Each structure stands twice: as structure tokens, then as C-alpha cells.
Amino acid sequence: EQGFENSVVGADKAVVVVNPEITSVRDADRVIGKLDAKGLEDHAVIVNRLNYEMTKRGDTLDVPDIIETLSVKLLGVVPDDRSITVSTNKGEPIVLDDKAQSGQAFKNIARRLNGEEVPLLKLGSESTGLFSAIRRLFKKN
């Protein structure tokens, strides 16, 4: 409790990071309630480690459910990306990897924090690429 109190003293804005898991969303809901009780109502959420395939199968919560549950604005979605592990082990920031969706997601979040209007990335197999397009064609038939 005291750590939370110390972290919000003097804050005028808060960013809550949540994983697409029920326990994480419950914890985030408690934190948002405490922020509101402290009068800190300017807050947003980042959904971290979103696995598109698991979400599509219904194995994890999806972004609209998370946002509806928490009743906050969405600042960004960071996909669960193996590139993060690789870049971390190399000691290199993921934002330097132009091919990593997670790196682009972090850049977009930073731009949104600076007031820019940046659309959310399309995540998962429905994004781009020849094989994705072929897969979608076969799924329709």
C-alpha cells in the first residue's frame, strides 16, 4: 500500500499496464479504483503481451473486453513477441528492430503519450503478408 501511495504523489496522469488474463485485469481494476479515489482520473491502459492466436481461440481476454471491464481509454496494445526476448538478451531496445511489431507498438504508444493520434496496429495473422492473404482465401471456402 505505501509503495502505491508513494508512486502516485504528485502524479497528474497514470498508465496502467495489464496482461490479457483475468487476474491481471482484476488487479488493474483495483489500481484504477485507487487512482480514482486519490482524485487521479487521467489514466489509460496498455494491454501487454497480447497473443492474437490465443485471443482468437478464446483462451485469453480480448482487448474490447478488457477496456469495457476497466472503463478506461486504451493507450496501446503490445503483442506477445519473441523478438522482445531476443533483443533483451542482446541488450538492444526492441524499438530499434523495424521488423518487430512490439517495437512499433512501443513507438506508437510513445507518440500517443505525446498527443499524436496514431491508429492501433493490426495484430496477428490478419495483418499483412502473402501467406496471410492465401490463408484467408482458403478459410472463406
Regions found by a protein language model. Give the residues of each.
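P-loop NTP-binding site
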Residues: 73, 92, 108-141
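C-terminal boundary of histidine-terminating zinc-finger modules
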Residues: 90-104
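Conserved catalytic-core segment of NTP-binding enzymes
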Residues: 1-80, 86
